[in-house]
């Protein structure tokens, strides 16, 4: 089974959500992930949704789709990849933590 990517699009930040979704799926496929998407009705923060989905990575169309505090929370549980510009953020490593 392939690792899981949690696709996230902030619809307030996106000017073309369908295009962004296609780009997230394309990057996930290229990196070898299967994509799961959030429940549209969920009010949970992105980090909690990604944790519930057991995601290995959260893929965003661009860095501005997550604020800095939420990015920090997401990086506690998953890597973060962005489509454009192409960035990779590794999850925080906790010294002595067993995962």
Segments from the language model and where they lie:
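Short, structured surface patches at the beginning of a domain
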Residues: 1-99
């Amino acid at each position: 089974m392939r690792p899981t990517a949690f696709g996230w699009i902030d619809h307030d930040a996106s000017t073309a959500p369908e295009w962004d979704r296609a780009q997230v799926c394309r990057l996930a496929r290229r990196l070898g992930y299967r994509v799961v998407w959030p429940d549209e009705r969920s009010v949970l923060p992105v980090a909690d949704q990604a944790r519930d989905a057991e995601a290995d990575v959260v893929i965003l169309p661009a860095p501005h789709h997550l604020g800095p505090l939420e990015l920090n929370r997401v990086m506690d549980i998953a890597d973060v990849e962005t489509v454009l510009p192409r960035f990779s953020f590794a999850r925080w490593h906790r010294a002595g933590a067993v995962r």
